Structure formats: structure tokens, C-alpha cells
Regions:
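Aromatic- and carboxylate-enriched substrate-binding clefts and catalytic-loop regions
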Residues: 1, 168-378, 410-414, 418-419, ...
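Catalytic and substrate-binding clefts that recognize carbohydrates or anionic sugar/phosphate headgroups
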Residues: 1-145, 159-160, 480-507
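Short alpha-helical segments and helix-capping/turn motifs at coil-helix boundaries
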Residues: 11-20, 25-30, 83-90, 155-160, ...
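Aromatic- and glycine-enriched glycan-recognition loops and surfaces
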Residues: 22-26, 80-83, 115-226
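Secondary-structure transition/turn motif
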Residues: 45-47, 563-570, 623-624
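Alpha-helical packing segments of well-folded alpha/beta enzyme cores
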Residues: 83, 154-158, 198, 231, ...
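Catalytic core of carbohydrate-active enzymes
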Residues: 266, 278, 288-294, 313, ...
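A carboxyl-terminal module marker
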Residues: 591-627
């Protein structure tokens, strides 16, 4: 992860853990590079390095590591996928995140601080404002479960808060802060029980729990019960399913960091009933992707620079064999800027993970923290992210041994314009979405309504995802209207997008329905992937693929074919309701359906409500509300 960069021609980059989190810093280096000329190189070393891509001498690549011997793997292959798979053959394939990991996570410390009334503090549910202190100032001490007349300051209250504001939440880390721990008893086992109590409550509400790492993960003599750790009991007894590493534990990086995530990567399935590990790390190296996703470090939100440099950072991470990349929502520090806050939530809808790192910023790091209009906009995009889960999960599975989820434009559309930095502020999310985030104030008014310039639309026809307006490709789009609510995102004509019902966590997904949104054009297809979303079964071949095809005939007729699902997994629902959302320009003359060789008679519904309640029905929405 080279922050702020992905195209290195004419540059020198450092291959070392710098613990530098802003533009130009190195968060998680990999001693590997590949070229569009059809080759790649990986150094087998943990030593620091410098890679010069024609900076000192044009046309020459000069690589060096602080080592007295040369140990390098050379890879000769055709294309990004083949070269990435050569790298994975040596270092391991990227992990497929559990489904809950695609939802927001909330991170803070809820076992350490004291809260006193203060008119300039944070407004709580009792109508009063409070300020926190890490020192005992006579205030109310927080706890995980709120059992000490302190519920509104507890970790349980966080879960309630998301629920009461109708906001999606997938997981919670209650000890993300130095000296926090997760219990206030005199024994480690007592604290484990306290953590389990939180875990039970969280799981009842569709939320998983995890832990931040400050120290050794296994019992160690001389460490107080507060900071003592036992990862085996945390996983086996308390139900921990997430681990976030930080510089206090893997700050050395290199082999130490790699061994650390590998340890947890083996413990979680073994002691967690085959649970799929969800590890978020930094200071990674070649091989980190086998066990963990990466976060980019601690940065300041509330400023446009935060969004700007992260776009090429995410693109570069996928190109470097680490498709599971994330960062804090609107930063860990700073904030109080509605425009930046909403724009960050918007573009990260089309990324794997979202972290609300609370407790350090100018405001609380909740999606509703800045009030309206940010609350409604953020909620709407979070719900959209939940709807897109079948599409996101399918491209995440592809990223295990194929294209990354977040794709540089040149991966799908290689040409002189895309093979450089001209398109560094836009990307493809899978094969069908083109995302062009708002990363600066161009002509913004006081409400944050703005425009986006320099959007490159490749060949083909591209459709504004929120208005349905069509644009011919092979052009640069300027002055694209982007009111505060609107992310510039385009869907390729011919797209097939698997969807699910809007939801707040994986438990709310209706497994008995499958939804496909289609933009018929020519002949196109998409392979949907699904599995249980929680276990390591997928590594043993347990999963289901469904091929969906769309074809526009010579008479402008559209045929959509869903082929029989292949495979199986624990909990797979074989009998499902199927809903098509087919984007057309006028009412079709005829709509027919066939299941196998059996024709199904369809009835025209008179309203959306009748359509939603009916079976074997169709409805033509002449003016759909796309936003």
C-alpha cells in the first residue's frame, strides 16, 4: 500500500514499513511489482528496499534491498490476473471476507474512560452533554455491558444507537484504545465472561464482536488482568470473530507482523467452529493478503485531501495483490465537515469495508453524527451497500484468484490514456460500475452541491446509475452535476447486477429471494457466487455459482436466462422467489416466462404494491424513482 499512488513510472518508491499514513507514505509494502509488458518480480526478503522506475535513468528499472545476497522470483505471464496469480502461488491467495465484514464496523474503547457533564460535550440519550477523560475525575466510568448505571456509555448502547437510527452495522470492537481491556474483574476469566456477555447481546442483534490488539495475544506472566489476553478463549468462549492489529503489536511489521496475523488466521477457524477469520492489519508484507485485509492507518478527516489520496491508494492496493483494503470513515481525527463526510460515505459504498473509528475526532464517528442532511444521505448509501451484497460478494470471490474488486481503468480498458495517472481518481467496481468520487470542491455552493470534471468513460454506453441518463463512451465528461446527495457512478449498458433486500446486517438478508437488475444491451453475462458467508467451507469447494445471461435480439426483444445453480453449501436455500428489474425505455409489447420447459403465465400488476404482494406478475414503472 503506497498511499496516494498506484502508477510508479518515473518515481522511486520505498519498500519498507514507515508507519506513515498520509500521501507519499508507505502503510503496507510488498516487495513485488509487475509490468503491463508481461513480467513480474518478487524479492524473497524482509529487508528494506528502494524501487526506481526510471527516476534516475529514463527507461531503466533499478531495484535494491538492504541485503548482501540476491533472492528473486521472476514471473513471465500475460496480463494482470496471470501475474497476480503467480504472486499468489508464492505467497497465498487473498482471503474472502465474511459477509458481515462488508458492513460498517464501529471501533472505540468502552472499558476505560470516565464521563462528566459538560455543556460543550457530546449529547447523549438522557438529553445531557458529557465529556470523557481517561483519568478518574469522579465521573461515571463506562463498561462494555452498561450494568453499573452507565448504560448510555456502554458498548451495548452503540449497537442500540445504530439500530435506533436505522443504520447498518456489521461488527463492533469495544477495546480499541490503549489501556482499555474488555473487563473490570480481577481475573482474565472474569473479563472473558464480560466480553462473552457483550458478544451474546451483539449476536442477538446481528452484530459480531472483535478485538483490537495492543499486546501479546496469549497469556503472559506479570500482565494485569485488565490487559491480559488469551486469544483462544476470546475466540472459543466469547465468540470473537474480528481482530484489528495496530502498531503497538505489529509495528515492526515484516516477519513479525506476518507471523502475528498467521497465528490468528489459524486460531480463529480451529477454536471458532470453522469461523472465517476477519483480520484487519497494517504494516503488512508479501503474504499478508492470505490472512488479512489492510487499513491505511490513522489520518485526519473533514478535509478533501483525505478522500483524494485514498482513491489511488485503494486502486494500487488491488494491483499489488491486496484487494481487501479499507480506511476510517471520514478519518480517525478531525471531521465536522458535512460535505467531506457525506462524500466519503458515498464512494466507500463501492469498496469492501468501512470503519467508524470513534473517540478521537472533532465529532463522534457515527453515520448520523452530523445531523441532517448527512444522516439521511449516509443511511441511503449504507442501505445501498447492503443491497449490493450479492454483487459485491461475487466480485470479492473473483478477487481471490482474479481481478481485484476495485479496478484501475486500464485493467478492463487498456489504452494510452488509462495506463498512467490520468484516471487515478476513478475506478471500476467489478465489471459493471464506474465510480468517480467527489474528492475536491470544484464549484460547490454553500450546501455542497458541486460538479465533477474529468470523468473518463471508456468505449460502450454508460448509464447514470441514479437518473438513467445515457452517455456514449470514448469521451471525457466534464461539468457532471453532483448535488450533495449524488455520487457520480455509472453502470455499463449490458450490466447484470445481483441484489438483495435493503438490510442492516446479514441476519436481515432474505435468503428466499434473489433479485437481478439488468440493463439489456447486446449479449452479456454475470456469474453470481454465494456461500455460507461465515466459515472456511468455501476453501473446501462449498459454494454456489449461478450464471445469468442477457441478450437483445434482432427484433429488439430481450431474453434473460438464469441457468441452474451449481454447487451447494450449508444453509443454501434452493427454492427462491426470483425478481427481475429490467431497465427498458418503453412498455414491452409482451412479457413471457418459462421455468425449464414449463411456460408460466404472467399477470400485469396495476401498482407497485400489487406487484410486491403478487406471484407470477410483472409491472411497468414508467417513471421509476432511481434515487
Amino acid at each position: 500500500v503506497q498511499n496516494g499512488r498506484f502508477s510508479h513510472k518515473g518515481k522511486v518508491i520505498s519498500i519498507e514499513n514507515q508507519n506513515s499514513w498520509t500521501d507519499g507514505g508507505v502503510a503496507s509494502p510488498t516487495p513485488y511489482y509487475w509490468s503491463t509488458n508481461g513480467y513480474g518480480m518478487m524479492w524473497y526478503t524482509f529487508k528494506k528496499g528502494k524501487y526506481d522506475f526510471g527516476a534516475s535513468e529514463e527507461g531503466k528499472v533499478k531495484l535494491s534491498h538492504e541485503s548482501d545476497y540476491l533472492d528473486v522470483f521472476y514471473m513471465i505471464n500475460d496480463g494482470a490476473v496471470a501475474l497476480l496469480n503467480d504472486f499468489y502461488q508464492l505467497t497465498g491467495n487473498p482471503v474472502l471476507l465474511p459477509k458481515f465484514g462488508f458492513y460498517q464496523g464501529h471501533l472505540n474503547a468502552y472499558n476505560r474512560d470516565y464521563w462528566t457533564e459538560n455543556e460543550k460535550g457530546i449529547l447523549f440519550e438522557d438529553g445531557k452533554r458529557y465529556k470523557e477523560s481517561q483519568k478518574d475525575n469522579g465521573g461515571i466510568k463506562e463498561s462494555l455491558n452498561g450494568e453499573k448505571n452507565n448504560y448510555q456509555f456502554s458498548a451495548r448502547a452503540v449497537i442500540d444507537r445504530y439500530k435506533n437510527h436505522d443504520m447498518p452495522l456489521g461488527w463492533l470492537l469495544p477495546n480499541d484504545g490503549y489501556g482499555a481491556g474488555y473487563g473490570q474483574t480481577e481475573t482474565l476469566d472474569g473479563n472473558i465472561q464480560n466480553l462473552k456477555s457483550l458478544g451474546d447481546y451483539a449476536r442477538q442483534n446481528g452484530v459480531e464482536i472483535g478485538l483490537w490488539t495492543q499486546s501479546d495475544l496469549h497469556p503472559k506472566e506479570g500482565v494485569s488482568a485488565l490487559l491480559q489476553r488469551d486469544i483462544v478463549k476470546e475466540v472459543r468462549d466469547a465468540g470473537v470473530r474480528v481482530l484489528k492489529t495496530d502498531v503497538a503489536w505489529v509495528g515492526a511489521g515484516y516477519s513479525f507482523g506476518l507471523n502475528g496475523v498467521a497465528d490468528v488466521g489459524h486460531i480463529m477457524p480451529y477454536y471458532g467452529s470453522d469461523a472465517r477469520p476477519f483480520i484487519i492489519s497494517l504494516d503488512g508484507w508479501a503474504g499478508t493478503q492470505r490472512y488479512a485485509g489492510i487499513w491505511s492507518g490513522d489520518q485526519t478527516g473533514g478535509v478533501w485531501e483525505y478522500i483524494r489520496f485514498h482513491i489511488p491508494t485503494y486502486i494500487g492496493s488491488g494491483l499489488s495483490g491486496q484487494p481487501n483494503i479499507t480506511s476510517d470513515m471520514d478519518g480517525i481525527f478531525g471531521g465536522r465537515n458535512v460535505q467531506v463526510n457525506t462524500r466519503d460515505f458515498q464512494w466507500k459504498t463501492f469498496t469492501p469495508m468501512e470503519l467508524n473509528m470513534d473517540g478521537w475526532g472533532a465529532n463522534e464517528k457515527y453515520p448520523h453524527a452530523l445531523g441532517e442532511p448527512a444522516t439521511s444521505i449516509n443511511r441511503w448509501y449504507l442501505k445501498l451497500k447492503s443491497e449490493l451484497m450479492p454483487y459485491a460478494y461475487s466480485i470479492a470471490k473473483e478477487a481471490v484468484d482474479g481481478m481485484p474488486m476495485i479496478r484501475a481503468m486500464f485493467l478492463e480498458y487498456p489504452n494510452a490514456y488509462t495506463q498512467g495517472t490520468a484516471t487515478q481518481y476513478q475506478y471500476l467496481y467489478g465489471p459493471y460500475f464506474l465510480v468517480a468520487p467527489i474528492y475536491q470542491a470544484t464549484k460547490a455552493d454553500e450546501q455542497g452541491n458541486d460538479i465533477r470534471n474529468g470523468i473518463y468513460l471508456p468505449e460502450g454506453v454508460w448509464i447514470d446509475y441514479f437518473t438513467g441518463e445515457k452517455y456514449d463512451g470514448n469521451r471525457i465528461l466534464n461539468n457532471f452535476a453532483a448535488p450533495l446527495w449524488k455520487l457520480p457512478v455509472f453502470v455499463k449498458n449490458g450490466a447484470i447486477i445481483p441484489l438483495t433486500n435493503p438490510n442492516n446486517n446479514v441476519n436481515e438478508i432474505d435468503k428466499g429471494i434473489r433479485i437481478y437488475e439488468l440493463y439489456p444491451y447486446g449479449k452479456s453475462s454475470f456469474t453470481e457466487y454465494d456461500d455460507d458467508g461465515v466459515s472456511e467451507e468455501y476453501k473446501r469447494g462449498k459454494g454456489v455459482t449461478t450464471n445469468i445471461e442477457s441478450e437483445v435480439g434482432s427484433k429488439n426483444d430481450v431474453t434473460v436466462t438464469i441457468h441452474p445453480a451449481k454447487g451447494d453449501f450449508t444453509g443454501f436455500v434452493k427454492e427462491k422467489v426470483t425478481e427481475f428489474r429490467i431497465n427498458v425505455t418503453s412498455l414491452p409489447k409482451k412479457v413471457t416466462a418459462q421455468v425449464g420447459k414449463k411456460k408460466v403465465k404472467l399477470t400485469k400488476a396495476a401498482s407497485k404494491d400489487e406487484f410486491a404482494k403478487g406471484e407470477d406478475v410483472f409491472f411497468y414503472d414508467e417513471a421509476p424513482d432511481l434515487n
